[in-house]
Regions:
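Sec-dependent signal peptide recognition
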Residues: 3-11
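N-terminal signal peptide c-region/cleavage motif recognized by signal peptidases
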Residues: 12, 17-19
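An acidic, Gly/Ser/Thr/Pro-rich helix-cap/linker signature
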Residues: 23-97, 103-106
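A contiguous strand-loop segment
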Residues: 29, 36-40, 47-53, 154-175, ...
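Solvent-exposed loop/turn segments at secondary-structure junctions
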Residues: 55-56, 123-127, 181, 241, ...
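Acidic/His-rich structured neighborhood in mature extracellular/periplasmic domains
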Residues: 80-217, 223
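Flexible, glycine-rich surface segments
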Residues: 171-285
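C-terminal functional modules
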Residues: 272-324
Length: 324
């Protein structure tokens, strides 16, 4: 009997604890955010109170955000997940369907068609996996219940509400990733506002359901935010001529060819021009794989600041290039 009462108490406690987490309108930090949105952007307070009154805390968002699988994942394993026959087959189909759109984006923005197709394939398998968590829930959870990155996600929540108003979206219906990224290319709200384009000229910037707009938007992002340099490589394979000590953790090229040789890296191809170079070390199950990165390596990193991600996009793009 005592155990039964304890169990009932625990159930009730968990229920009310979860309810408190979800009752965002009762919290001072949320009230302050609502006041900020009202004062700065003239949002109606009653409207925002209704939105946040129905927003719910998503504990799984916190749980997944706290995981960092890439930190312990080898390049071999990551590449096998991201660049495989299934994804390449889907990429071939996407290219066949949107060849003209990809080429048009390449001509306008200077981004290789295979890079555009690669990013959309890596991000969502060409729209098959776009995320199924309400964006208002994920961003509210991360803005108000994830102190480590609260500042960033508060900005994204602000951008999301502005985006919804500007594009006439219902903010309670949009779904995305655990971090609030949306659509074919998984744009965060600020990227949607700043870089999404109406590439099919139908009057709507729809990267949520329109692959043509997504193609143009990914290209525009890499052109403007990525500062892509046409006719410049992403990376070239390298060999180690001696034991290499720790490599600086950065995405910005900072070395000359001579400096690379001094630390023990030798390119397997001729390096074009007098370019700044980046030594790249990828963990394998045994040893390391070495590459030399260029400015366009940094360009892709502005989409996702992970060297595994950048290299997966690059290698996948090489596989897709034969279909263009």
């Amino acid at each position: 009997m005592i155990q039964k009462k304890i169990n009932l108490f625990l159930i009730a406690f968990l229920f009310f604890a979860q309810s408190a987490l979800g009752d965002y309108t009762a919290r001072n930090d949320v009230k302050e955010f609502i006041e900020f949105m009202h004062e700065k952007y003239d949002f109606e307070k009653t409207y925002l109170l209704e939105i946040f009154g129905r927003a719910t805390h998503q504990e799984k968002v916190i749980r997944i955000m706290n995981r960092q699988p890439e930190g312990t994942m080898t390049w071999e394993r990551y590449r096998a997940i991201m660049v495989n026959d299934s994804r390449i087959s889907a990429g071939k189909e996407f290219i066949n369907q949107h060849r003209e759109d990809l080429k048009r984006a390449e001509n306008i923005y200077g981004i290789p068609a295979e890079i555009i197709a690669s990013i959309i394939g890596i991000e969502t398998r060409y729209g098959r996996i776009k995320g199924n968590i309400r964006v208002i829930d994920s961003l509210s959870t991360l803005a108000f219940d994830y102190p480590r990155r609260a500042k960033f996600f508060k900005t994204q929540l602000e951008e999301f509400l502005l985006l919804s108003r500007e594009e006439n979206f219902n903010p309670e219906l949009l779904e995305g990733s655990i971090a609030g990224a949306m659509g074919y290319g998984q744009f965060m709200p600020d990227s949607y506002r700043n870089y999404a384009v109406d590439f099919d000229k139908d009057g709507i910037r729809d990267i949520l359901n329109n692959p043509v707009d997504a193609i143009g938007s990914v290209a525009n992002f890499l052109n403007k935010k990525g500062k892509w340099k046409p006719n410049t490589p992403v990376a070239i394979k390298a060999n180690a001529t001696k034991e290499i000590n720790s490599i600086k953790s950065t995405f910005k090229p900072y070395m000359t060819s001579l400096e690379l040789e001094k630390i023990g890296l030798e390119s397997t191809e001729t390096i074009p021009g007098n370019l700044k170079l980046l030594p790249i070390s990828l963990d394998l199950s045994e040893g390391y794989e070495y590459w030399i990165g260029f400015d366009n390596y940094q360009s892709i990193s502005r989409y996702n600041r992970s060297k595994l991600y950048v290299m997966a996009v690059f290698e996948f793009s090489n596989a897709l290039s034969e279909f263009l």
